[in-house]
Curated annotation (Swiss-Prot):
The keyword GTP-binding does not apply. Activation of RuBisCO (ribulose-1,5-bisphosphate carboxylase/oxygenase; EC 4.1.1.39) involves the ATP-dependent carboxylation of the epsilon-amino group of lysine leading to a carbamate structure. Signal peptide: none annotated. Keywords: ATP-binding, Chloroplast, Nucleotide-binding, Plastid. This is Ribulose bisphosphate carboxylase/oxygenase activase, chloroplastic. Belongs to the RuBisCO activase family. Residues 13-32 are annotated as: Disordered. GO terms for cellular component: chloroplast stroma. It is found in: Plastid, Chloroplast stroma. GO terms for molecular function: ATP binding. The keyword Plastid applies. It comes from the Eukaryota. Its main location: plastid.
């Protein structure tokens, strides 16, 4: 995950604090 996109990692965690990562969830599914 960190190797794929280290910059996004921080954004992902930040989204969790703000609320549900609706914009990050689809990206994760595609990566998987």
């Amino acid at each position: 995950l960190v190797d794929t996109f280290p910059g996004q990692s921080i954004d992902f965690f930040g989204a969790l604090r703000e609320g549900p990562p609706t914009f990050e969830q689809p990206a994760m599914t595609i990566e998987k």
